[in-house]
């Protein structure tokens, strides 16, 4: 019989609204025996059943909910339903040649990410309770893809994020099943990329910016473009493929720059798109001092904060990078700026960019606001699923 977790009085509103997490400070009592990773029943303070989830006393996220139905068996049939729904959603909303097939809590499979790069799957498991289901879900996903004529060539696990330690889990990296060539060529928005699922960041590629990159193609045509924190050259190459006159990509990682140059070669853009290894925060003032100006500046920095407590310092970081970027935009040019931190809200990022514009005597005209691609769905009951904010502005000098 499953252990029963009873919440404190007044807690459980997030769960009732459809959220997935129960934190350690929300729990009143736990009745019955359990091991970490086990499925438990969750009740509110008055004993009303709220659903089932897996428990982990090593984590502040004590329970991750799997279902609101206490009579629901968490078995292969249940997992098959979740996987099928996730794949059907992607087929409806995005180009599925390369996409995020499972996005954790937003697909009601908390703690699990699966990315598809053509015929390769990359798995990231961030929750102890999901470990027991991981390989079953991979098997079910392969079956689901096969129904659409997609044969999976190989599966690689990239469960090597620091979040694993918060769950009391070791970092894991390696093949699930037979070994295979882990270099995969994908095509997105007309651009070819070599994705290294073993050594690339996260699962090898940032799929969440897919349609934001596409949105920049129109703006970059015929323009001089600076792409900061370029990583594998994604925004820079979208600019190049759209007909930008000259594109420079900057990244601090030598490996990333090597990959970006290889991607430029694959697309025949070596003469137009150039990459340099540089610390962006140091390089932008040097470019400004030398008199460089660009029609388009793209700022896609790593997350400056991964916790609420670090938000204050993150604001300073975003303000600094946007000030430095704005100084390089020609009058009438364009700035694309974003944050991939959940804790940097849309309102907070907008306020920070507005302050940067004021500090540089620039006026901003918003072209559009965008967020993560639909294969990274935002579950309104789970705030943590909304993390990417992407602004495009026209930049006008004060006159």
Feature names for model-found ranges:
Residues 1-118:
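Non-catalytic accessory regions of SAM-dependent methyltransferases
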Residues 3-53, 127, 176-178, 184, ...:
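S-adenosylmethionine
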Residues 59, 129-131, 201-202:
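Short, surface-exposed beta-strand-loop junctions and turns on beta-sheet-rich folds
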Residues 77, 81, 85-89, 93, ...:
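A short, charged
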Residues 104-115, 134-205:
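Non-catalytic substrate-recognition/targeting regions of SAM-dependent transferases
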Residues 174, 178-399:
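Rossmann-like S-adenosyl-L-methionine
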């Amino acid at each position: 019989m499953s252990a029963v977790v009873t919440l404190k009085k007044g807690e459980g509103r997030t769960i009732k609204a459809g959220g997935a997490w129960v934190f350690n400070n929300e729990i009143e009592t736990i009745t019955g025996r359990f091991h970490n990773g086990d499925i438990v029943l969750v009740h509110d303070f008055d004993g009303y059943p709220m659903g089932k989830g897996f428990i982990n006393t090593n984590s502040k996220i004590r329970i991750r909910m799997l279902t609101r139905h206490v009579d629901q068996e968490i078995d292969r049939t249940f997992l098959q339903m979740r996987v099928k729904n996730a794949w059907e959603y992607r087929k409806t909303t995005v180009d599925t040649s390369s996409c995020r097939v499972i996005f954790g809590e937003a697909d009601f499979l908390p703690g699990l990410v699966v990315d598809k790069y053509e015929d390769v799957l990359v798995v990231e498991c961030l929750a102890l309770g999901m470990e027991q289901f991981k390989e079953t879900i991979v098997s079910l996903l392969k079956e689901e893809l096969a129904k659409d004529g997609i044969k999976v060539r190989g599966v690689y696990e990239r469960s090597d994020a620091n979040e694993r330690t918060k769950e009391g889990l070791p970092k894991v990296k390696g093949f699930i099943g037979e070994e295979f060539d882990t270099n995969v060529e994908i095509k997105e928005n007309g651009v070819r990329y070599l994705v290294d699922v073993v050594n690339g960041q996260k699962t090898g590629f940032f799929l969440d910016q897919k349609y934001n990159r596409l949105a920049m193609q129109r703006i970059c045509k015929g323009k001089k473009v600076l792409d900061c924190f370029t990583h594998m050259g994604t925004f820079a190459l979208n600019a190049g493929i759209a007909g930008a006159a000259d594109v420079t990509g900057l990244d601090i990682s030598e490996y990333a720059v090597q990959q970006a140059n290889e991607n430029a070669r694959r697309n025949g853009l070596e003469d137009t798109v150039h990459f340099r290894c540089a610390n962006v925060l140091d390089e932008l003032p040097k470019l400004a001092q030398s008199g460089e100006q660009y029609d388009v500046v793209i700022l896609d920095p790593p997350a400056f904060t991964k916790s609420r407590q670090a938000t204050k310092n993150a604001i300073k970081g975003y303000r600094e990078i946007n000030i430095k970027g704005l100084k390089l935009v020609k009058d009438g040019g364009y700035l694309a700026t974003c944050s991939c931190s959940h804790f940097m809200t849309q309102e907070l990022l907008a306020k920070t960019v507005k302050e940067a514009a004021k500090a540089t005597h620039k006026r901003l005209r918003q072209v559009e606001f965008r967020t993560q691609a639909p294969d990274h769905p935002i579950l309104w009951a789970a705030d943590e699923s909304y993390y990417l904010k992407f602004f495009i502005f026209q930049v006008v000098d004060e006159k």
